[in-house]
Amino acid sequence: MSEKSENENKEMREYWKAEEEKIIKQWADKALCYHWMHSRCREIYQKKNTWFTIPVIIISTATGTTNFAQDRFSDDMKDYVVVGIGSLSIIAGIITTISQFLQISELNEGYKTAAISWNKLHTDLKTLIARHPLDRMSPNQAIKLYKEQYEHLFEVSPPITKKVQAMFNSKFKKSANLIKPEICNKLDPTDIFEMSNLERECM
């Protein structure tokens, strides 16, 4: 058999090997972990976004209303009203600037998008590996497809906060069967495909 035919057979192979299923399981578990952590980060930043946004809304509404009604104040009070409106406007501006500097709103949306995307990847991987091997897509196609998705999500997702990492490690420290991401202070040794000398000689 020619080398070209052998390569075509490898690409057309439909059956799954145990090590390929192990790779899919690792990605599925890690995707589930990332979904959980990004969801917790979203909850934290959603609260932060609320605490930064509501005061600005209240101050802006109050200053706008007061500014509109300036003529109703006595001449003695107008100077104080102007100073008060100016001070509140400065405070609102400072709060908005701090929020923008800390990227509260952007991170809030980023964590939301990441949580949804990681959950979708986990669902796809879980569905794939739960099916009968003969009903799945080819292993080479699946690994190429989901490797690209996993790496892309890892690159574009916002960083997990230390607080959420600590929460995750505390909550799931006894989940020995769950394969966790490396960011959770867990380094796994690199696996090598095991073959006997006879199997290597027959390759």
Model features per residue range: what roles?
Residues 2-58, 69, 81, 95-203:
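Conserved non-transmembrane functional hotspots
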Residues 20, 64, 77-79:
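Generic structural motif recognizing short loop/turn segments at the entrances and edges of beta-strands
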Residues 59-75:
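Juxtamembrane "helix exit" motif at the C-terminal ends of alpha-helical transmembrane segments
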Residues 60-64, 87-98:
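Single-pass alpha-helical transmembrane signal-anchor segments
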Residues 75-88:
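Hydrophobic alpha-helical transmembrane segments
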